[in-house]
């Protein structure tokens, strides 16, 4: 099996943006609805809305990876990193500190240019309670990075990422692509396209020993709210978790080719459904 990064013209993704035409009116409507609702809220209620969405994202992005935290632990972690005073509960699971901190970092830095240092810092922030991996640095070693499922002896290899020696250049190119793909907030089609490619591109590189899925979803969120130029409440992981099997099937398919029209259509629908979820949560 040949993977996307093994093609000579990697990472020149091919796609037809015409498939998004039927989604654009709906996407624009949801953006307008949420903006209107947020603007009608008091500052305190706006902050609470963002907080609740950050909690949902932290809980669900962790659940996708098989880690389960209480909303109370996540809320206390986020509030501490936002310097919100009050009676904060003791955080029982220290890993909740990491994912809560990451949610805050995404929002604090959403307007900043993406850098490798930022991505490494996010990884260190997320995984600081993990004693078994190297945090904040790219993976090294000769063993292939493979996405595997199945019982021992009957493993199925879904994907094999680029070798570790290729990671520094791959990440340099990824960050360069991200920053050069500039999107006007009114260019809603390219907001969907860039966010979809951003997630796929990073997941295909898989630069860290662990935590790649969570960092990849964090990057998709940053890409989305940075492109809109506002910290829009959204929880992509809530919708990915609900459609987990389909998500992994589509990701696997997209990582076998540079033709990613189906992936962009699928992930764009995830974004729009995440907007609907945010709206329902607010109202």
Range-by-range predicted roles:
Residues 1-283:
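FIC/Doc superfamily catalytic core
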